């Protein structure tokens, strides 16, 4: 029988002022009801346009009637819902998202400035220091402008219509500039950064405001399960800013079985591949730094990394997948639970901030039995 198993932790990290608070007991797997054989699981920001993501998805669930043919059809239906009047966000919440982006844009600029000329910020009465300060600000604004201008943009967003949306919603970077740059700043700096902000809004650069939803299960015409993950920033000017994430599957040869991760990519990669992605980057960078004058060095480094991947795939990854292919659905569910447990243990041992933890929810989906929860909070 074909099917899939899904597991998720239930920890959330909530921002309270400038601090972060860890909270347990948050379900991240959302089920639409008995008529549909799919679920949506969530990672990233807990809100979309300042609306809790659970409420947003539940509002969409209520609009679903008969089951759809494919998982892709469910994804398309959700995107269409987000831009409809049935979606719970408002013009005010669209404006709040833009204000948050403006604040973030200026804050990043401030952090970069502090690293360069932060040592003179308390002595700007000195004309030479004031000149250095202003020059550094303008240089940073130009760098931000060049960076955001070259990034890929969300569908339906260009410089002209994005600027119009920002104007219509009465948003600017001015209040953030006054807050983060109380020492003062030249008018040219503000003008360039305001222009950079237009491209920031239109661009696909990831931010802490982004949510990630993975749709997994079966449509009525699908024999085999499917999973699709989309990155969501929110609705701005009545248009949804979203981007499909196609690089979220670790698959066996022949693509008969795979692991789709909604979050914690590096950990999931290391469990399956045998080492963290950072190891590949380190090997690649070490080779290129050792012999930078060699014209073929980049090609050599790439070949070494590909060789590592091939060896581990042949000796470790594919045999593991072949064994997993013989699991029953209940055994597959236990395996997904254990994968999350491994990441919880890794997070505890790392000494870094807790980003995964709490009770684990897990379930299976197949064409005969539909959604069967193994554990649900």
Regions found by a protein language model. Give the residues of each.
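N-terminal nucleophile
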Residues: 1-377
């Amino acid at each position: 029988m074909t099917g899939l198993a899904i597991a998720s932790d239930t920890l959330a990290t909530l921002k309270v002022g400038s601090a972060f608070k860890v909270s347990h007991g948050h379900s991240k797997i959302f089920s639409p009801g008995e008529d549909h054989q799919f679920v949506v699981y969530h990672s990233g920001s807990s809100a979309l346009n300042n609306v809790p993501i659970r409420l947003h998805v539940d509002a969409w669930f209520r609009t679903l009637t008969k089951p759809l043919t494919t998982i892709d059809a469910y994804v398309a239906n959700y995107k269409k819902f987000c831009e409809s009047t049935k979606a719970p966000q408002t013009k005010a919440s669209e404006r709040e998202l833009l204000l948050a982006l403006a604040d973030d844009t200026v804050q990043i600029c401030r952090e970069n400035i502090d690293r360069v000329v932060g040592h003179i910020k308390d002595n700007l009465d000195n004309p030479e220091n004031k000149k250095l300060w202003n020059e550094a600000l303008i240089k940073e604004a130009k760098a931000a402008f060049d960076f955001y201008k070259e990034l890929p943009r969300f569908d339906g967003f260009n410089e002209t219509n994005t600027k119009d949306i920002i104007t219509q919603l009465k948003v600017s970077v001015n209040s953030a500039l006054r807050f983060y740059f109380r020492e003062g700043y030249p008018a040219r700096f503000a003008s360039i950064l305001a222009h950079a902000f237009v491209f920031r809004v239109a661009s696909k650069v990831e931010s802490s405001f982004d949510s990630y939803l993975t749709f997994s299960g079966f449509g009525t015409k699908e024999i085999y399960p499917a999973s699709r993950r989309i990155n969501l920033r929110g609705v701005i000017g009545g248009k949804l800013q979203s981007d499909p994430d196609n690089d979220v599957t670790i698959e066996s040869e022949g693509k008969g079985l795979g692991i789709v991760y909604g979050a914690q990519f590096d950990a999931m990669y290391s469990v399956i591949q045998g080492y963290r992605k950072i190891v590949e980057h380190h090997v690649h960078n070490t080779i290129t730094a050792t012999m930078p004058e060699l014209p073929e060095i980049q090609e050599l480094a790439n070949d070494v990394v590909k060789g590592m991947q091939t060896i581990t795939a042949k000796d470790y990854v594919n045999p593991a997948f072949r064994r997993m292919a013989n699991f029953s659905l209940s055994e597959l569910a236990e395996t997904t639970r254990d994968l999350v447990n491994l990441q919880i243990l890794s997070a505890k041992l790392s000494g870094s901030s807790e980003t995964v933890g709490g009770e684990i929810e897990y379930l299976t989906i197949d064409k005969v039995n539909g959604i069967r929860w193994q554990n649900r909070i």
